[in-house]
């Protein structure tokens, strides 16, 4: 277990040990965070029905769109705080923490109001099926009421991860996930609240996790990142850092999610069985996404602290190490999902028609996961060095624009579910090649002093 505890200075020592020490708790933390929606889907699919499952599944793209925006902005705070921590600039660190926490309140309030009132319009724009529309609208409206604690939690844990503390966020997520599971079962099985019950359970769990992380930051008495609510201000320098790094990252997330909205709209043009199968597949492929996300976030923190300390060659070495680690993880996940496709899909929805479609999706897509890992890892390293604009442009063109072109020009000619799914590996491969070219030949790894002068 000692191996999984990061040392106080990640600018020295074996790179793989530091990355693994970050990755393991972050992976489990991401697992429990994903467990919110997975448990919702499981409870609805098994105890309510496939129409309710399609309703909850139809909300996924919209939820990911909003989450992508504020997690993108949070990444700006994470990188700035990690660089200050690596360079031991404690006053800048303090200002960054208090600016980030105030921003989380403002962003959460905005999305709470906007999301609640725009939900019906957004679902209609997505072409949500009539039988799934009422449940999807109810779920989303309740979900958006919990935006403030959701954003506060993500920003607060971002602060902790930026300074290398990945264990406390894990503990908070475990507590929140247990709360979510218990409330899901109680509200659906005992009170028969169906879709509303799983949404209420999710919001209550988010409130608990937000309270835990804020209290933890306030009680970090000897730490330079201790949080004092009365010191929350919008300081100019942290705002600049957050916007320079966070806005392109947020836009990239928005474009990813927007392209997925079009994917969801295309999926909605098929049968309810197809929508339910796509939802079940989405809950399975989350195991890959939480793995690559955990490794990418670990690398961003590692890169940010080493960039702040001027350890540029060590930063580049960490990219090679993380790529080798992630390739091994990806091959193992892909093989397991391919071989166990039938029981995995049946776990979420045993309906025969849904099961057949779900198995086909799993075995078509999981072998292509390996084509995506460079996008996430190279972008994470470059972002840790304070650059996020060019990766955003590459991703928007390679993933989003090309994916939309596929949906508008290829899918209408060959209107099948697998043809829609094929948009993923095709765009991943092209974008991976483009981001590697920028990583190899672009001028992204400039010394901090030069970067500051340009700003």
Predicted segments, located by residue:
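Short alpha-helical transmembrane segments in multi-pass integral membrane proteins
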Residues: 1-23, 81-146, 190-247, 303-368, ...
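Small-residue-rich hydrophobic transmembrane alpha-helices
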Residues: 53-113, 150-169, 277-341, 372-395
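Hydrophobic transmembrane alpha-helices of multi-pass small-molecule transporters
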Residues: 65-68, 180-185, 210-214, 287-290, ...
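Short runs within selected transmembrane alpha-helices of multi-pass transporters and secretion channels
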Residues: 74, 142-161, 169-177, 198-213, ...
């Amino acid at each position: 277990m000692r191996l999984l505890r990061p040392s106080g200075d990640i600018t020295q020592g074996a790179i793989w040990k530091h990355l693994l020490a970050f990755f393991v708790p972050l992976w489990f933390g991401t697992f429990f965070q994903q467990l919110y929606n997975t448990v919702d889907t499981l409870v609805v699919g098994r105890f309510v029905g496939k129409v309710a499952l399609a309703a909850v599944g139809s909300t996924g793209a919209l939820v990911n769109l909003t989450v992508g925006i504020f997690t993108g902005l949070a990444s700006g705070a994470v990188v700035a705080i990690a660089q200050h921590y690596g360079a031991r600039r404690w006053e800048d660190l303090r200002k960054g923490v208090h600016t980030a926490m105030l921003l989380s309140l403002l962003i959460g309030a905005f999305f709470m109001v906007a999301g609640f009132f725009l939900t019906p319009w957004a679902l209609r724009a997505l072409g949500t099926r009539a039988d799934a529309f009422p449940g999807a609208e109810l779920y989303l409206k309740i979900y958006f009421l919990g935006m403030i604690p959701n954003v506060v939690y993500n920003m607060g844990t971002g602060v902790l991860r930026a300074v290398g503390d990945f264990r406390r966020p894990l503990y908070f997520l475990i507590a929140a996930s247990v709360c979510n599971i218990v409330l899901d079962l109680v509200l659906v099985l005992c009170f028969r609240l169906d879709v509303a019950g799983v949404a209420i359970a999710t919001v209550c769990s988010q409130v608990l996790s937000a309270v835990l992380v804020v209290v933890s930051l306030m009680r970090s008495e000897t730490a330079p990142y201790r949080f004092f609510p009365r010191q929350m201000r919008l300081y100019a320098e942290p705002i600049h850092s957050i916007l320079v790094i966070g806005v392109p990252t947020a836009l990239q997330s928005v474009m990813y999610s927007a392209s997925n909205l079009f994917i969801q709209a295309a999926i909605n043009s098929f049968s309810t069985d197809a929508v339910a199968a796509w939802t079940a597949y989405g809950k399975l492929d989350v195991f890959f996404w939480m793995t690559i996300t955990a490794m990418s976030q670990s690398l961003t923190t590692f890169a940010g602290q080493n960039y702040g300390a001027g350890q540029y060659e060590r930063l580049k070495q960490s990219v090679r190490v993380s790529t080798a680690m992630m390739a091994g993880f990806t091959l193992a996940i892909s093989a397991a999902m391919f071989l166990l496709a039938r029981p995995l899909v049946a776990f979420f929805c045993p309906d025969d028609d849904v099961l057949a479609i779900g198995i086909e999706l799993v075995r078509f897509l999981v072998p292509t996961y390996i084509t995506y890992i460079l996008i996430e890892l190279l972008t994470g390293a470059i972002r840790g060095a304070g650059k996020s604009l060019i990766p955003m442009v590459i991703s928007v063109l390679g993933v989003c624009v090309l994916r939309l072109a596929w949906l508008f020009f290829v899918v209408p000619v060959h209107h099948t579910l697998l043809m829609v799914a094929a948009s993923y590996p095709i765009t991943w491969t092209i974008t991976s090649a483009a981001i590697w070219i920028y990583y190899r030949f672009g001028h992204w790894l400039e010394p901090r002093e030069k970067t500051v002068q340009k700003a």
